[in-house]
């Protein structure tokens, strides 16, 4: 059982990275903030005004997402370094990372769909480009993130019991 729990912790850490956009695999220079790139993509669909995304509400949502993603990335990095220095392996905090990562990944694709407008409605056929179809399908795929590695509800229970030490 201990081995199975440890494997799930590693799986949750991997899934958590998806909320960063591609498992956190983007290359960056030291101290460089990587944004989601959604603002650039949104300008293509929603237009731009004075070099900014024309829709101020969508612009605010994307900026908020990028800020939260950067904070999450730094938190995961800090937890990873703490884990390495103590040689303790993944902690119950992996449930927090998995939960937040899967929710963040869903939000990322929902924002892309919002930016794409009616171009996000396609499944196949003319009128939709390959990238648009891929984003729509990936959005549907994000729903599985809240199931794999333990459902979001299970993660919240683990967080309540093992991280926050709340009574049952």
Residue ranges and their predicted role:
Residues 1-21, 119-168:
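Glycine-rich phosphate/cofactor-binding loops in nucleotide/flavin-utilizing enzymes
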Residues 60, 99, 158:
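Short alpha-helical basic/polar micro-motif
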Residues 6-13, 44, 68, 77, ...:
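Short, well-ordered loop/turn and helix-capping segments at boundaries between secondary-structure elements
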Residues 56, 70-127:
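C-terminal helix-coil-helix/basic helical segment that borders enzyme active sites and/or dimer interfaces
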Residues 1-73, 145, 161:
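Glycine-rich beta->alpha junctions and the first turn(s) of the following alpha-helix
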Residues 48, 52, 89, 119, ...:
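Short coil/loop linkers at secondary-structure junctions
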Residues 54, 64-68, 89, 93, ...:
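Secondary-structure capping and boundary motifs in well-ordered enzyme cores
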